[in-house]
């Protein structure tokens, strides 16, 4: 597969700086650039682009979920959440005796 790009030099005769399309100048300054892309390279580029798009979409979805969770937390009544401990919490309950005994902090939105 090859892609042709046509590049027209701006014709500056008679002080023309309009920047318009000068295809019909007939001054022979047209330059054609040919870029050859191998089929496997093309497929790899397509795959990379799709992967980037999927990652971007995933980040957008995660952000929306987090915003929804923040809204839900803000709407909840401001009360202390019960702690789900297997043993009653105590001041010296900071020793980690088993994975079930790990204390946690309840974070509330203000």
Curated annotation (Swiss-Prot):
Residues 1-29, 73-100 are annotated as: Disordered. Residues 1-16 have a biased composition (Basic and acidic residues). Residues 20-29 have a biased composition (Low complexity). It comes from the Eukaryota. This is Putative uncharacterized protein DDB_G0271558. It comes from Dictyostelium discoideum. The lineage of its organism: Eukaryota, Amoebozoa, Evosea, Eumycetozoa, Dictyostelia.
